[in-house]
């Protein structure tokens, strides 16, 4: 709440009245920055805001401190028109560019028809409408987004007006007619006749009917077919044959128009290929008599997913996860801290999100409205990992580099693996030190941004994803398709090479399997002026730049080499057929080739004879007098296009078996030659050797300057050394492509319902000509005609070295000049959308509106679909008031600072704004406006003029109402797809809804597919040292994905209670659905439960009841806990080690709860990847304390970090001697210590919601917060409540009383009856109804004692229900009181009810603190009648807390914890494997397999490992007598031995009033602290 007017200091009025008498500086400062004295009065300040849960229940110190704690524990304290748009993207003739009335009329007619068809389909489907991606004059068919399995029915083929029942009764003739109607809505009689008699068609149509096969696919060693039946013509019915004919005719018509093919052209065939550029792109190649055609459907953006339609006025919070490609913590040097000016070894961590068009940098993952940096990827040139050899100032790890030689020596391997270990272990606080890790850079037109990643795997992942996004933005048209046409007359030469040879050891393994081939087509770049050809000025500039570069590399090149380009196509199948067909085409076109060669030679002569700029002029009309096909391409031609080829060029050279055809050879009559040679032209084939001779893990080859100058790709000969290799290298990766066939009818819909003449309009022609990056970029209409190039981008070389146009001084001068006129602008209100004729704020100058809109789009990295509504000048209240400009867009409220040196920016989606209202300003001179944001603090703005504030309020409310009315029917462009937690308005789902929508499941599955693809890329890189970003096609015929060729054997190892095992069952079921084998190894008590879910079971030692009793008794980490654990569980630990080792035999991947303590050692012995997963903080961080050492009051980041070090040290001291003995005797491994275990580097999965446990920015890349792993056992559906319970709840509702749940599980307390009495009294005083689950008991309880003392009688306001399924009960009540376990806390949050937590032990203290911090509940430090009564009243009546709990529930229901965990497993699998390989290499290097010796390692006390700790370890002292471990006497805390136990001494602790649960003795509430100086 803002301060009242009467609280404003009178000095403020005086300051305002005397403003005109002050100097210019005072007038300026008073207008820019309001007086700051209000900061101490404004309760809305973050420092003064009342913390949720910090209510009377906790503020009354006497209530909780003076009274007895009754509960004191014992001893404790798709789109249908995508391909169609591609087909007719270029069908209009150049003469039609100006447009005409007929074409515009046809466009309007077809647009209306398409709208009717689309609305008809939406009404038929009766399903939620998918969001549409940004599109330019094309539409998306919702049916494509449906699950593949759901589309395998005949309903897709039914006419628009028929339902399923009617369609199923149609006779064959009617069904044929429906097929015709579906494919040809205009009932083209000529096409129907042509389908019946193909001889009536043109040559091209007849050839397509004969040779086009849309489902052409064959199984290979690297491509597996799933559920695909390849039928022959004999097996097809007449209906199927007719459908194929109509479909092929439709394709022929579109191919002819989009590629400008002649009727006399002949279609030879279509083939599946991979285009090799900076990505490996899956696609198709068409061969005709006159051209080589390539096209592909790029993957659709996944922000097409939306929630279901809701009722008017409601809403549903839906974040922008559909638009997020990757997110995580990265280091970055920013000007904010002087990092870009001063070279330091430090960096600062930020939260970075990669989206479809931007990279956005935030301070933390919880503050996504105020970005620090926005990088527009539409202006991005390239992204790459920085190698130390290329940039010595980047400070990457010096130890991770590739040797100059290709062969790997054992000595180099030893140094590399050893250094990799040591570098990883040097990090103590990862938030600042960047001596390890890797840098990568993102180069844009204006600036180069550098980011620091913790591992090379993470850096590669970021770079690969950025490269894929940039490729799609720069190399596709607005319809998300890649198109290329190479006229045969422009082809200079082509050759076919084998990618892999036949190695000696595998020469017979493949039998008759066809080997992959690469087709290299060399053609004259921009040789023909086509639809996508460059303009004269751009062609001249690009040819000049590229020729200069090539001349520097190879001064002896011929002119045709300088003007040529190479395109590489990888064919896993049909390589020989493609080559022979291309030979046949060339032979048939030899006459055209001669004509072309004459023209080409004339160009060469001009180049060699002329000086100046005329030599590279574009072709003139005189050149066009000869009829030749026109070149078409959406691909860029920059010099970074073939980075994969460049990588392969760096590999060692060898001879290859090459088929080569050089069209420019003078040895034949028509300039053609067909030969079989040993040319090394195939750079792709060099990929083979790297697979058979892998480079070192993480290696990056250091090259000398001479090596860096790679040979020109146009050269055809060079001396090489050959090594033959079969496919076994790729097979050993155990990954393969899997293709599943889509429904034929769904494929047909991609070619139907067309807008025949839509591309004839000038606007559509321009949009289809531009790349997606330019099509989505902010633009202003210009009277000059735009160049016809596909990108309209400057050549990268022209802006790479550009310096800033304005110096720092000039920019400051401009800022001061702007500020001098700021008072005249304070009252400026601008409307860019006219409200009515009397709108005085509306800017009527069209050009001015366009300029302002473009600036708005550019400053916030929006695309050109975002519209500006209004703008204002105001102050936004943050830590200090910041003056700037507010922009109201159609879907966002944005702000940018106008103060020099202040870079505050805000992008707030309107979808997250509940409402806004007027408030009084900080003083009389200002008028306030407050924005109420869901799940966020209120945002305050202050205006110097009241009329501006009132207009801003009215416009925001108007836009909110407009968005609510539009609801889900608004296009995706009106939703916030770029920033923040955006979504769509609809009715809030009730808290009882716990199921996830199918769209969210699809999104999670899509992310898993990308994770598998990333795993495959990692495997290729580890095996070959090549960075190969792979882009899979979104084909209408097949769905291609990467899958492991064999099932992995997962072992999930955990100990503890039922709550510890349940998440692993949920994860195991998810892995089973992925096709893997899963075994859970845990206590025998849970065997029946686990096997019942279809998961294999293996038993390990331990009694969960005893473990729980120990934890409850001691509450948290303490000296008494360590003593009792050592005395009682030493024998159990040995059994745990032995049984766990036995249970993990045969595993491929081990996932372990770190409480089991054995996973790292077993994985090292088995040589398998190892991943940790847990429900509480276990990673070193400054954000959260260790779950077992939670202080009563927050002590800051340094304390939090040291708690993790303390716990790691204490736990290792307790088990180190037994573990080391077990390693030597059972595992055959050497002794280890905490330093070499490097637990910090192990991949970690937190099965906690990121809403409750937001990932910290100092988490390393391999730590993932996935969300809760909920196990849906159907208990809510199967549970039958008793009649008494139903009546009790109905009566409470009838009496208008709140219903709460109270249950603490089976805890043991000092006095159970007193606890029951306190609960009864609290419930009665709070006037609520209680469902009680009484499971607690006395420490000294016995049957005789229980009979002697009567049980507490429960009043009618309390119903003792016993155990009830949480997922059934919690959605039906108003609040819950429990002990704070991870599972119970997640259940209450998912149900959306406020939670009261009374922690007893372990992580319960952490969750109590977190629930209170996020404002969704209350944490009770002491439980008694008074405190519980106050908490119950607050939880059932605090509207803010209730609303917060509901909002958290909405977010939790959108999470897919299990699927997110599977995605993370795939992402981190190769990194986890590399850690184990490094450890094994270290053991091998020191010959430590027998465990007889251990290398000397200097380590500090926190890692010190002493064998004297174990009295039973005398036999080991002799073998280790010669080994010495140095101790550092300057540690932060000391370790003292007392009865073989460890006491932690922390000198930084203050007085005993600050209770710290770290070493209290049983029954003592005060912390025992030893003076560190003694």
Swiss-Prot record:
Keyword terms: Cytoplasm, Glycosyltransferase, Lipid biosynthesis, Lipid metabolism, Membrane, Repeat, Steroid biosynthesis, Steroid metabolism, Sterol biosynthesis, Sterol metabolism, Transferase
Basic and acidic residues biased stretches: 107-121, 128-138, 149-170, 702-711, 964-976, 1510-1533
Binding site for UDP-alpha-D-glucose: 1057-1058, 1060, 1333, 1364, 1366, 1379, 1382-1384, 1403-1404
MF term (GO), any: sterol 3-beta-glucosyltransferase activity
Pfam family, one: Glyco_transf_28
Residue stretches making up the GRAM domain: 253-288, 854-920
PROSITE patterns tied to this protein: PH_DOMAIN
Subcellular location, record wording: Cytoplasm; Membrane
EC number: 2.4.1.-, 2.4.1.173
Reactions catalysed according to its record: a sterol + UDP-alpha-D-glucose = a sterol 3-beta-D-glucoside + UDP + H(+); ergosterol + UDP-alpha-D-glucose = ergosteryl 3-beta-D-glucoside + UDP + H(+)
Domain of life: Eukaryota
GO cellular component: cytoplasm; membrane
Function recorded in the entry: Sterol glycosyltransferase responsible for the glycosylation of ergosterol to form ergosterol-glucoside.
Family membership: Belongs to the glycosyltransferase 28 family.
Protein name per the record: Sterol 3-beta-glucosyltransferase
Biological source species: Debaryomyces hansenii (strain ATCC 36239 / CBS 767 / BCRC 21394 / JCM 1990 / NBRC 0083 / IGC 2968)
